[in-house]
Every structure is written in C-alpha cells, then in structure tokens.
Amino acid sequence: AGRGARVALSARSVDKLRALAIENALLLPCDATDTASLATARASLLAAWRGIDLVIYLAGDYVPMRAADFDLAVAERVVTVNFNGAMRLAATVLPDLRAGGGIVFVASVAGYRGLPKALAYGPGKAALIHFAECLHLDLAPQGIGVWVVNPGFVATQLTAKNDFAMPALLTPGEAALATVDGLKTGKFEIHFPKRFTRVMKFLALLPYGLYFPLVRRLTGN
C-alpha cells in the first residue's frame, strides 16, 4: 500500500485486520482452510473491484515437531494451513487471473530439504514449492505470473516457539519489503536474506551421504 497499490487484506479475525491500520484497505475476513469462506471473500472482492491483479498466500502455521513427539492431528492441521489452504485459494482465484497478474505463495527455505524439528512444517512447505513450480509451467505461457517466496527466519509469534538461535533473523517489515522488491525482478523464486538462503541452497544440492551428517553437525542434532 505504501508504494501505491490498492490492497485487500484477509484473515480469520477482522479485528486483527483493522489493527494493521492500512489506509483504504479492503478488509475481507475469511478462513483459508474453508472453501466456502474463500468463495465469499472472492465474491466480495469482485463486487468491489471487478477484478484481481495479484494474490498473495501468506497464511501459515508452525509447530516444532520431531519423531519422538509426532502428533498426527497437529501435523495435519499444520499441513492444512500451509499447503491445502494454498490449493484452495488457487482453485478459488485461478478463473479470475489474467495476463499481467498472478499469484504468490509464501513457502520457506524449510521446504528445500528435511530439517530437525520440521516434521510437521517442512513437508507442507516442500509441497507448496512443488505446487507453485507446476502452476508456473502451466500459467507462464499465458502471461500469468506465479512466484514462490522462500524466506529464512522472520520474527513472528510462530518463530518465537523456537528454542534455538535463528541466524539472519528479519523483522516482518524487512521480509515484506524483500518480497515486494523480489517481485520486481520477475524471477520465479524470491528468497531472503541471501546470506542465509544461499547456504540453505548449497546444502540442498548435497547428496544424502553428506547432507544428513552436516545438518546434524550444524544444528547440534
């Protein structure tokens, strides 16, 4: 909004949307895990603006989890928000996207490869990256953009659950600016901060025989 865009915001709580105090923003409360709720928000948006230019899926959940405390119900909830919700959004808005517009999925570098404590979080983010890649192959020839954002650590209520030092930690504002700047490049993947994500990309290239022992050593696990 600060750069002149007309913005619509969605979340389950309209009070949280109002608390953002973004001037002239259209508030569309909805639940990303509920198809009917997304359809209602879409109808309200089209009634107000007659079209959709760019959609960003930022909904996310995170619970640190390892095999010793694996909880299927919790893991399914996390995946439902992080991945299934993104598919629901895509199904809702794809008919409205036109050349010059597009859709952005916020995933994570945790989706590159398996990591300690990411038993519930990582798989959904990996699936989201794959989903975005498939959509890009289909939609790019039509002039419709698809982007995936893979941040490192961002200081939020979710990452506050971590009991370890988070390298290259960004504020939400810094992450938002990096995302907007990344969209200007036209590149499919937007990843930041580079000093951290480049390390993660290097690790992702390693064969398992090197990757597993190195990650255990780096994480103390």
Where are these regions (language model features)?
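Residue(s) in the substrate-gating loop at a strand-loop-helix junction
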Residues: 108
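Conserved NAD(P)H cofactor-binding loop of Rossmann-fold oxidoreductase domains
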Residues: 58-63
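Substrate-binding pocket helix/loop in short-chain dehydrogenase/reductase
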Residues: 66-67, 74-77
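Conserved glycine-rich Rossmann-like NAD(P)H-binding loop of the short-chain dehydrogenase/reductase
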Residues: 5-18
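Active-site helix of classical SDR
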Residues: 90, 124
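C-terminal helical subdomain
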Residues: 148, 164-199
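Rossmann-fold cofactor-recognition segment
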Residues: 21-36
